[in-house]
Amino acid sequence: MSRIIGFDAIVHGNDKILILGSMPSIKSLEENMYYANPSNRFWPMLSNIYNMPVTTREEKLKLLKENQIALWDICHSCIRKGGMDSAIKETIPNDIELLLEENPSIQKIICNGKTSYTLLKKYFQREGICCSSTSSANARKTLEDVIIEYKGVLL
């Protein structure tokens, strides 16, 4: 297994919220875009909450910018067999502290799933809000459940 390297942060200089995932999925890495797996509910959830389309990459980036949302992953790199968070090993974290220092307008950190939250606590001892994973692997939650949960912390 080779080491997987994630994406750069998406930041706009005036963001109020940072959403942290764990590590991009295989499909996301192939498409070079966060949450590119069509079964992941991340973009449909944000589209519903902010009433904005997310059909194209440009629309997704516009939604983040207009709603002052930064996006990144806890892991800069890791070893992972398959796409599940449970398979993440040998993590090297991104420099979340530096990102927050360079973007002091960020007031809230939201973790997309337990793995992200656990790694945030492990590496940074930062306060974050742990929300349910938007991954389709989280079958216990419907899209509507996820929308309600995230709406409560985003708005």
Question: Could you describe each region identified by the protein language model?
Answer:
Residues 147-155:
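A polyampholytic, Gly/Pro-enriched intrinsically disordered region
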Residues 1-108, 112-118, 123, 129-132, ...:
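A polyanion-binding, active-site-adjacent surface
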